[in-house]
């Protein structure tokens, strides 16, 4: 019995290994491994890390610092859903905590350390490419495509422009995997195949990954569901509507199952940040915005980017001149091989004679019209960006459509289908124009080489397609299709590698300290060269001291010294730039105020815009203090008590020298720098907004607290008339002290109030915070536009501020209920199937 069981197991395994799909996937894995070895050669075998400081500077200046902060908190056991190491403080649901690939990266960081974690970012990008290929192959397997068509199309999908361009922003690339998987289970639902019951689970996995991209995926999947049901024959309209509504219910169930994460992330995106702000226009203005054509330059960029994402780079993606409408990322990303352009255009021509029902043809022409209108006009970018300002970040949806049609067209050609020669020539001419324009403005030789390779492979593709117009022999046609497959590999590998060349990247090792001066001098000479290629290549070769600065021992010693010396909740800043422009605190583990955040707290942003716009650096997503150190009053107001500096002689009217640790000096603010303040007088927010100037802001912020329903004043001087001398004295003798948090989501402190008044906490005003005074729950107010505040009665009190991510409790309850509903519905399906089988028997 045992031997026969083993024989059956071996036979099953042998049959599995001989499966055409398994062999195709093995070959696909090997082909992608070789391709990625070439594309990422400088990152795998050279000194580059997939961390950019050019147009992709979010990776260096923001993302890796966020990841480092998360890893550091996990390693020392202090992780919480609020983080004071990021600016004035941030809800951790701002980040994609449950992106599976980022979770893998965090795990590497916890085990090996945050610095070593950075070495594996490019490995994770390659892993995404592999998973994307397998996911798309699985999706294509729901149809009757041939194995070669599925394999070559999945290869093109794995190296599509969106994953290789937007994938440089790490979490953005993951959607390229989730979307075809959602379509896969949607298709199983439509065809009533085994596994259709897992459709909501796939939506759940997407829902805990990203609210922003889940919305786009759901919108696109809903359209896919609608059009696929319309294509089906043999259904009444009532049955179609029922099937569509049931599919929508499955998606809603999946979102409900993900509410434990989805809802807190949605709270941040929709209620705190200003990422999705609209201009508040009326319906007619909104429709005009949706259907007013883009500029001519946009359409030219769109045409070029169908053939390559690198035709407008000019002299690189750093400080060199470029030819984009917006930039390398935000212009439409449409490339998924030159062959895909030819075949998608051909599809529109051959569809009318294709072997499918008239209903299916009409639906597909409708889909084509919808895609054309959605991409050519702002309506597509508007709808996919939550009906706000249009963006082009939804184009990952188009990659799936383009390559699905490419797979169909390849099988159509394999079966002897006729092609339209005129369209082949037209696309060839358009391709020639795009590559000619790109070559003319390409600055670096690497860009020109890529364009030449794309041109040659494009011409070879056109020649192969032209031959297919005339040759009827199936064997010869298969040879030509094989040649086209090889040409496609060269095409996408050349283009893919170019996305990662001539980039300003972080290096795996710093320039040695002893040659830093010499290398910096060489960089300056290159930067001022008359030769444009040398001049713009300078940023690529700029000497690096990132790791030396980020992990310097004396800075860690300074922070430990302050931690032992001062038990209160204080903030630290630096008067110099080291690892990043504004995110060193996240990486180095101290509480500052500088930050870079694309989804900035809208209340704090309004405070900065109103009172201290000089905190903005370059745009409204960066706050920096190193260039505002001289304003020690602002430092004291925000709780910046200590400054780390390389200067041993501070301005003694503002800071005093506290100590020296290594080569760093610790300066202490001469003013009373606290993270909380006491006031006896209030003014209205509107008064603060109307009156605040550079000349009177210290008086307005220092003498009164601004509340939403505070006292209206016409001039800053009126505050003194509102406060009698006794009230002024009581205010001066009162204090609010916060203790250093052990976990940032829990802040304790005490209040000494010699009169009734208000406490202002220099913590961003955000849903999720709750307050107790002497154990009794108290109401939190919005103070000074951007911060937490409360009323405080006279006397001595203890306070407790606690942060619970808004939406987390409700989301947890919702998730539990929807999971129960999911389990019950699946059990019901199983029972129905058993009943049906027994009735059939």
Language model segments and positions:
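Membrane-embedded helix bundles of polyisoprenyl
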Residues: 34, 126, 130-143, 148-232, ...
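Periplasmic/ER-lumenal interhelical loops and adjacent helix-loop junctions
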Residues: 57-74, 78-81, 91, 95-103, ...
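Extracytoplasmic/lumenal acceptor-recognition loop(s) of multi-pass membrane glycoenzymes
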Residues: 90, 94, 487-549, 560-634, ...
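Hydrophobic, aromatic-rich transmembrane alpha-helices
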Residues: 323, 336-368, 461-471, 827
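Membrane-interface helix-loop-helix junctions at transmembrane boundaries of multi-pass membrane enzymes
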Residues: 235-245, 346-372, 595, 610
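Contiguous transmembrane helix-bundle modules in multi-pass membrane proteins
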Residues: 192-195, 213, 363-551, 794-841
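Active-site-proximal, structured, solvent-exposed surfaces of multi-pass membrane proteins
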Residues: 5-8, 66, 704-841
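Active-site lumenal/periplasmic loops and adjacent helix-entry segments of GT-C-fold
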Residues: 41-143, 148-180, 205, 290-330
């Amino acid at each position: 019995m045992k031997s026969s069981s083993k024989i059956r197991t071996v036979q099953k395994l042998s049959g599995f290994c001989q499966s055409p799909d398994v062999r195709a996937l093995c070959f696909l894995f090997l082909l992608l491994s070789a391709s990625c070895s070439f594309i990422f050669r400088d990152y795998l075998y050279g000194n580059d890390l997939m961390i950019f400081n050019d147009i992709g500077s979010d990776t260096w200046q923001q993302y890796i610092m966020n990841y480092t902060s998360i890893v550091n908190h996990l390693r020392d056991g202090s992780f919480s859903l609020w983080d004071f190491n990021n600016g004035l403080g941030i809800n951790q649901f701002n980040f994609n905590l449950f992106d599976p690939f980022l979770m893998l990266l965090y795990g590497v960081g916890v085990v090996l350390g945050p610095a070593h974690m950075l070495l594996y970012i490019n490995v994770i990008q390659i892993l995404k490419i592999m998973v994307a290929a397998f996911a798309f192959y699985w999706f294509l397997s729901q149809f009757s495509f041939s194995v070669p068509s599925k394999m070559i199309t999945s290869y093109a999908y794995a190296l599509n422009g969106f994953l290789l361009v937007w994938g440089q922003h790490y979490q953005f690339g993951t959607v390229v995997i989730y979307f075809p998987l959602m379509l896969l289970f949607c298709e199983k639902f439509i065809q009533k195949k085994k596994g259709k019951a897992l459709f909501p689970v796939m939506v759940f996995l997407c829902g805990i990954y990203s609210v922003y991209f889940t919305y786009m995926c759901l919108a696109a999947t809903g359209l896919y569901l609608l059009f696929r049901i319309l294509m089906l024959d043999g259904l009444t309209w009532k049955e179609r509507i029922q099937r569509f509504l049931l599919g929508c219910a499955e998606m809603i169930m999946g979102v409900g199952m993900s509410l434990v994460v989805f809802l807190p992330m949605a709270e941040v995106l929709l209620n705190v940040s200003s990422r999705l702000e609209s201009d508040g226009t009326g319906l007619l203005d909104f429709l005009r915005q949706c259907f007013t054509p883009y500029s001519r330059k946009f359409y030219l960029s769109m045409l070029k980017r169908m053939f390559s994402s690198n035709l407008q780079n000019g002299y690189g993606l750093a400080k060199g001149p470029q030819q984009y409408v917006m930039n390398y990322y935000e212009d439409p990303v449409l490339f998924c091989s030159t062959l895909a352009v030819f075949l998608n255009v051909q599809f529109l021509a051959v569809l009318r004679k294709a072997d499918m029902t008239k209903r299916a043809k009409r639906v597909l022409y409708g889909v084509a019209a919808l895609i054309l209108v959605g991409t050519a006009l702002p309506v597509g970018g508007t709808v996919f960006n939550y009906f706000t300002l249009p963006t082009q970040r939804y184009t990952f949806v188009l990659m799936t459509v383009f390559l699905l049609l490419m797979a169909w067209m390849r099988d159509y050609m394999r079966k002897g289908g006729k092609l339209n020669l005129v369209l082949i020539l037209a696309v060839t001419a358009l391709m020639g124009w795009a590559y000619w324009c790109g070559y003319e403005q390409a600055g670096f030789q690497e860009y020109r080489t890529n364009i030449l390779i794309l041109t040659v492979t494009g011409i070879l593709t056109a020649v192969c397609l032209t031959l297919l117009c005339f040759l009827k022999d199936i064997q010869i046609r298969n040879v030509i299709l094989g040649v086209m497959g090889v040409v496609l590999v060269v095409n996408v590998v050349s283009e893919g590698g170019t996305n990662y060349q001539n980039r300003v990247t972080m290096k795996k090792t710093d320039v040695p300290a002893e040659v830093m001066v010499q290398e910096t001098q060489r960089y300056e000479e290159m930067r001022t060269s008359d030769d444009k290629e040398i001049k713009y290549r300078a940023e690529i070769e700029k000497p690096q001291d990132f790791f030396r600065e980020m992990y310097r021992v004396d800075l860690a010693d300074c922070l430990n010294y302050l931690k032992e010396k001062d038990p209160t909740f204080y903030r630290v800043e630096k008067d110099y730039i080291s690892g990043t422009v504004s995110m060193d605190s996240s990486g180095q583990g101290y509480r500052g105020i500088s930050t870079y955040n694309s989804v900035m707290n809208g209340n704090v942003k309004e405070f900065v815009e109103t009172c201290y716009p000089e905190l903005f650096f370059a745009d409204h997503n960066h706050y920096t203090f190193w260039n505002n150190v001289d304003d020690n009053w602002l430092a004291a107001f925000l709780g910046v008590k200590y400054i780390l500096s390389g200067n041993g002689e501070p301005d003694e009217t503002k800071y005093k020298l506290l100590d020296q640790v290594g080569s760093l000096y610790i300066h202490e603010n001469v003013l009373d720098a606290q993270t909380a303040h006491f006031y006896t007088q209030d003014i209205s927010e509107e008064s603060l907004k109307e009156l605040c100037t550079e000349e009177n802001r210290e008086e307005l912020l220092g003498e009164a607290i601004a509340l939403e329903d505070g006292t209206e004043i016409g001039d800053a001087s009126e505050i003194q008339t509102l406060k009698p001398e006794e009230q002024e004295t009581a205010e001066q003798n009162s204090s609010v002290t916060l203790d250093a948090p052990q976990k940032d989501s829990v802040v304790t402190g005490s209040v000494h109030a010699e009169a009734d008044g208000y406490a202002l906490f220099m913590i961003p005003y955000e849903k999720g915070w709750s307050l107790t005074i002497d154990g009794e729950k108290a109401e939190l107010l919005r103070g000074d536009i951007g911060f937490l505040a409360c009323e405080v009665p006279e006397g001595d009190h203890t306070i407790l501020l606690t942060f619970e991510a808004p939406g987390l409790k409700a989301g947890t309850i919702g998730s539990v209920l929807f999971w129960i509903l999911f389990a019950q519905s699946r059990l019901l399906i199983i029972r129905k199937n058993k009943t049906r089988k027994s009735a059939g028997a």
